[in-house]
């Protein structure tokens, strides 16, 4: 995956989605690219170990809320995400946040149209998790 231009990939996918060029600020491939959203956590995109990773940080729920939502969270985690290297989304927990994460298969990171589909599907998973939490 050495020849990926992450900035161009993200820019092309945002144009495909319909984002006006005026709101796409200078993108930098030396750090995570952040797509800020109005009513949801930001989507972060970066190359990690030469693979494209997407993640979003949700406020960490209480243990009680996490336990009461476990069934719905498990269903979300078991939904197929065909663009991912393991065909699933991952969920990581820390004291501050619950992180929804996916590492994208190399085959899908060279086309802005395909990457727009990935962003859309990841956003749909974010909506599900947000509704559960």
From Swiss-Prot:
Coiled coil: none annotated. Pfam families: Invas_SpaK. Disulfide bonds: none annotated. Keywords: Chaperone, Plasmid, Virulence. Homodimer. Required for surface presentation of invasion plasmid antigens. Chaperone specialized in the storage of effectors within the bacterial cytoplasm, maintaining them in a secretion-competent state, and allowing their immediate delivery to target cells upon contact of the bacterium with the host cells. Has been shown to chaperone IpaA, IpgB1, OspC3 and probably also OspB. Belongs to the SpaK family. This is Surface presentation of antigens protein SpaK.
């Amino acid at each position: 995956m050495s020849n990926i231009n992450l900035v161009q990939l993200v820019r092309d996918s945002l144009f495909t989605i319909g984002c006006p060029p005026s709101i796409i600020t200078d993108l930098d491939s030396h750090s995570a690219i952040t797509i800020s959203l109005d009513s949801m956590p930001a989507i972060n995109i970066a190359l990690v170990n030469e693979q494209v990773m997407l993640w979003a940080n949700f406020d960490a729920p209480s243990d009680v809320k996490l336990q009461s939502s476990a069934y719905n969270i498990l269903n979300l985690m078991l939904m197929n995400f065909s663009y991912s290297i393991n065909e699933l989304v991952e969920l990581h927990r820390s004291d501050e946040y619950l992180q929804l994460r996916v590492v994208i298969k190399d085959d899908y990171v060279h086309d802005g149209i395909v990457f727009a589909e990935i962003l859309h599907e990841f956003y749909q998973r974010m909506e599900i998790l947000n509704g559960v939490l």
